[in-house]
A protein has these predicted regions:
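Enriched for short, Lys/Arg-rich terminal
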Residues: 2-5, 9-31, 45, 58-66, ...
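A short, surface-exposed loop/turn module that caps and links secondary-structure elements
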Residues: 34-61
Length: 87
């Protein structure tokens, strides 16, 4: 089942940052987003981790950056894609 993906305003700003600063990281984020859309919130690459305080999940982009998201109905809402999560 394909899930729709939306970005919070902060997450969109993060995404635009990667577009201009680091194409390798952007490519990794795009791969994570494609897998989230195709396979859902838990499966795929990036080591999904349940976050307690924000009732969301994160996947590892690289050693310091995380893709943080929540699932609402059939939609995945990206909360951030730059920096560590704040759990």
């Amino acid at each position: 089942m394909a899930h729709s993906i939306t970005f919070s305003p902060d997450a969109w700003a993060d995404y635009l940052y990667w577009q201009s600063e680091d194409k390798k990281t952007l490519k990794r984020i795009n791969k994570l987003l494609q897998e989230l859309q195709r396979d859902g919130a838990v499966q795929g690459i990036g080591k999904a981790e349940l976050l307690r305080k924000i009732k969301g999940m994160s996947k590892r982009i690289d050693d310091t950056n995380r893709l943080v998201y929540t699932v609402e109905n059939d939609s995945i809402v990206v909360l951030s894609c730059r920096g560590p999560y704040e759990d």
